[in-house]
Amino acid sequence: MSALRVHVDGIGLFGPGMAGWTLAREVLTGQAPFELATVQLPPVNALPPAERRRVGVAIKLAMATGFEAARHAGADAAQLNTVFSSTGGDCDNCHNILETLASSDRAVSPTRFHNSVHNAPAGYWSIATGCMAASTSLCAFDATFAAGLLEATVQAVSTGQPCLLIAFDTAYPEPLYALRQIPYAMGVGLLLNPHKTAASCASLSIEPSSAVATPMDDPALEDLRQRIPAARSLPLLQRLARGGTGSVVIDYLGAPNLAIEVTP
């Protein structure tokens, strides 16, 4: 595979101790200390009240990161192709459905069943934005962020149109947590453009690599990177926060990983 090249027009990030890209950028550049805290999400005011009442953390997280990336770029969310990438989707919802099925009353809530499909966030996004552009939902276990980045990049390059990547993960409650130990919710949004614009803050050149993934210097951030699939993005986000030129390797399938050259 030859290198793929796109430009980053917008960034969104909500995770533990990083409520939005502005605060996250300060943490990632060392201007502010990283303090572990539960992710704080804004209300999803773009959804009608009935839908707003039905959504859980996963959809709120996807909405928050997507809208922040679009705002950062000054882009119209209603016009953007999207890629939603999540290793487990709505884990709380999955837990509740399984709990119901294990009980004497096995009647699953229609709303919970509706929200259990992997592309539910894409559906709520279309309701919130009125977007009728193409949307893809995928997962790839621990390689989910890299798989989403590749998919969004290929779509941007092949269509000649911007593509918004929304990668997010949430935590399973026990007993499922014992089998899939994602400790915190985290979401990342990247608006990728095949053309350099006034909104572009960096350019990415992406290609396969046999090199090992770039670790985070901060032990607490490295712990997040290793334990949350969406946090495999942190070395790239840190490079973007610092500005200038540099390269990182992010986890993909191990052989290969993805090498990313970042330039202004």
Question: Which residues are covered by each model-predicted region?
Answer:
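Active-site-proximal alpha-helical scaffold in enzymes
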Residues: A62-F67, H72, S137-C163
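Conserved "HGTGT" condensation-loop signature of ketosynthase/thiolase-family condensing enzymes
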Residues: M1-R112, V117-A134, A167-P264
